[in-house]
Amino acid sequence: MFYTENYDVIVIGGGHAGTEAALAPARMGLKTLLLTHNVDTLGQMSCNPAIGGIGKGHLVKEIDAMGGLMATAADRAGIQFRTLNASKGPAVRATRAQADRVLYRQAVRQALENQPNLDIFQQEATDILLERERAAGVSTKMGLTFRAKAVILTAGTFLAGKIHIGLTNYEGGRAGDPASVTLSHRLRDLGLRVDRLKTGTPPRLDARTINFDILAKQYGDAELPVFSFMGSTDQHPRQIPCFITHTNEQTHDVIRNNLDRSPMYTGVIEGIGPRYCPSIEDKIMRFADRTSHQIYLEPEGLTSNEVYPNGISTSLPFDVQMKIVNSMKGLENTRIVKPGYAIEYDYFDPRDLKPTLETKAIGGLFFAGQINGTTGYEEAAAQGLLAGINAGLFVREKDAWFPRRDQAYVGVLVDDLCTLGTKEPYRVFTSRAEYRLLLREDNADSRLTPIAHELGLIDEARWARFNRKMDNITKERERLKQIWIHPQSEHLNHINGLLNAPLTREASGEDLLRRPEVSYEKLTKTAAFSPALEDKQAAEQVEIAIKYQGYIEHQQEEIEKQKRHENTLIPERFDYSLVAGLSNEVRAKLEQHRPVSIGQAGRISGVTPAAISILLVNLKKQGMLKRGE
């Protein structure tokens, strides 16, 4: 049965990847359909009620800089905001928000329902239609067929999902939701490489049964940060604290004594779990010398009694979960509202994707989110945005776009996945980026908003505000260059009050701000350099750009050297068997990975600099040496 309307883009799945994937092409003016098994769970935070963190906050800022939704939703739902690594350098500072699940979901749904060019339909997708090795639409469980020129799959943990609690298991996409079994079988028939991964979640606790009076409180920052470049603290709801407790020897004994009932330690679960968010069972076994682990009790919302105990993800049986919880300080009489569980699910080898997240085998079919082997809301949303952009460009038959590693954390994420693949759930860290001083949270807009404007992703109000900010930064830097303080200046005493050593020769405002003891805020409070910029975001960029100018210029020089190879493209169907001098091992790896550029080829493990030289010579001989943008 064919539906009466055709679409440009269809998105399967309404999680964090799916919502961004649907909004992007709709903003670009393309007729888009979002298919979800349940409209009421659009934007659902299935695991921890938080957005951001180290590396992850950077992704949220980048999504926002390109017109995405996540930052705005987090600002409207955040009930505790903190800047992590605030005392460290600007490259690793990161925003994190504890979020009210209901408010977050409401913000997402409101944005989706009010987005022009976007339709939402509640129905389970069971098949992807193909014509001449290209995606042509989707069919659903009730027999409806929707036609489209591009399809984006963002199925999360739903593909052949299996939930484990103790030695009991059953099909499910997450607690309370069915798995997508039919679609999983169909996708396996397409010849794509499929494997299994595992993730988990802790039990949810009843706040009314927790003794908060004897627990340490963790408050948010006094000066509240915001996620969105268009946001303000006025959007934040009421702020509340989290609480901290700890596991102890009794907790650890309970876990060790019940490992024979753990699906992970009895071989029932075969999928590999996230390295950086291990289950409490894994923590106890891997860090056997530790007598205690810190557990954060995170409220799930302003109107909810549920509490998320961050740090005790588990798939042990329910009776064991109760003993674990009741063994901890403040939780002696606590009730569990929802049991913790582990979930195994299908994921696809991301090396079978182009950096645009289009599958190499099937034109117009894009994958985004956990099905590409990642973990985390932010990683999923970033992929959804990129897939949505490129699905739109594909439909319009325009050149694809994806960010470089030196351009965005999204670029680092996608390059790591598509070049190296992953055998465990992948998450972003600042340490994964070679040029992290250039990929800061504060400058995500200057890196990406002009591109978003060119792609049609942002409105004129945002574009005008961005340009005002950039203009203010330029003018302020020039102003600080022009103001000089000399040893006879009437302002000398005020300036010397900021310095570790008195000024002995003339210095400009820029010179003074380069000194580690001088901040922009302090400098612009002096009569010589007031007034300060009213825009705190612009002021922050001015200070960082001046203080770290030497380091930034050094990284930019390194990037220019790398670009020579990064922008040297390899033809899509290049025949490596014709390249004399390559070892069989290198040839096999290049055939397997199909890198899109010389730079990407050089990051494949085992592909030597000598092999790259041979490849460059061969491309030149065949007249295929082509530079990208």
Swiss-Prot record:
User: Which keywords does the record carry?
Assistant: Cytoplasm, FAD, Flavoprotein, NAD, tRNA processing
Species source reads: Actinobacillus succinogenes (strain ATCC 55618 / DSM 22257 / CCUG 43843 / 130Z)
Query: What subcellular compartments does it reside in?
Result: Cytoplasm
* Quaternary structure and interacting proteins, as annotated: Homodimer. Heterotetramer of two MnmE and two MnmG subunits.
The answer on whether this UniProt entry bears the keyword Ribonucleoprotein reads no
SUPFAM superfamilies registered for this protein in UniProt: FAD/NAD(P)-binding domain
Q: Which cofactor does it need?
A: FAD
Name by which UniProt lists this protein: tRNA uridine 5-carboxymethylaminomethyl modification enzyme MnmG
As recorded in Swiss-Prot or TrEMBL, the protein's gene is named: mnmG
